[in-house]
């Protein structure tokens, strides 16, 4: 099979976003804030001009091809995050025992889940992630897609019921809407 000479992925940069590349570290600044990430892969080169970020690899094998696409997606998510932000909405569902959810610093505390006496806790990942609770709605917002998604997963996993049929015992906090919205 013929080997490709190189693979190049080009990511456009919006006008109000600046991308700085220092070696393998990519810094993206925008209206929402700043995200830094290190992409330390030997064969892959990342460069930019005023309008585009270019991810390139010469004579790639299968893993290098996949890594170029992965890095392109990460940089695209960073650009979108500082420009627009990410919002995940969750719903508190209970049948008999009313659970209360509170945000205390970097911890989400879930009290009275299935009548349990000890509270369940979920960690908020990242400094830029904000969790708000209004009634039965939990909203998670931030500029880093990975931190927002992991915080959402931590909250959902904290209310996972073990040893019972989840079709019958549907109590928990579940993802309702994933949205990429404009920053306020």
Swiss-Prot record:
PROSITE patterns: RIBOSOMAL_L6_2. SUPFAM superfamilies: Ribosomal protein L6. Part of the 50S ribosomal subunit. GO terms for biological process: cytoplasmic translation. It comes from Methanosphaera stadtmanae (strain ATCC 43021 / DSM 3091 / JCM 11832 / MCB-3). Belongs to the universal ribosomal protein uL6 family. GO terms for molecular function: rRNA binding; structural constituent of ribosome. The keyword DNA-binding does not apply. This is Large ribosomal subunit protein uL6. GO terms for cellular component: cytosolic large ribosomal subunit. Keywords: Ribonucleoprotein, Ribosomal protein, RNA-binding, rRNA-binding. This protein binds to the 23S rRNA, and is important in its secondary structure. It is located near the subunit interface in the base of the L7/L12 stalk, and near the tRNA binding site of the peptidyltransferase center.
């Amino acid at each position: 099979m013929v080997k490709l000479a190189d693979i190049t992925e080009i990511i456009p940069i919006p006008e109000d976003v600046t991308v700085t590349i220092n070696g393998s570290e990519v810094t993206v600044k925008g209206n929402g804030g700043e995200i830094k990430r290190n992409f330390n892969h030997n064969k892959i080169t990342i460069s930019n001009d005023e309008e585009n970020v270019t991810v390139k690899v010469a004579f790639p094998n299968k893993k290098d091809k996949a890594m170029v696409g992965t890095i392109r997606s990460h940089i695209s998510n960073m650009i979108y995050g500082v420009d627009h932000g990410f919002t995940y909405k969750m719903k508190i569902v209970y049948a008999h025992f009313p659970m209360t959810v509170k945000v205390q610093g970097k911890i989400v505390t879930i009290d009275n889940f299935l009548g349990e006496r000890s509270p369940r806790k979920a960690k908020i990942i990242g400094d830029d992630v904000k969790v708000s609770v209004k009634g039965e709605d939990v909203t998670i917002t931030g500029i880093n897609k990975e931190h927002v998604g992991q915080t959402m997963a931590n909250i959902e996993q904290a209310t996972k019921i073990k040893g019972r049929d989840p079709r019958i015992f549907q109590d928990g906090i579940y993802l309702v809407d994933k949205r990429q919205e404009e920053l306020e």
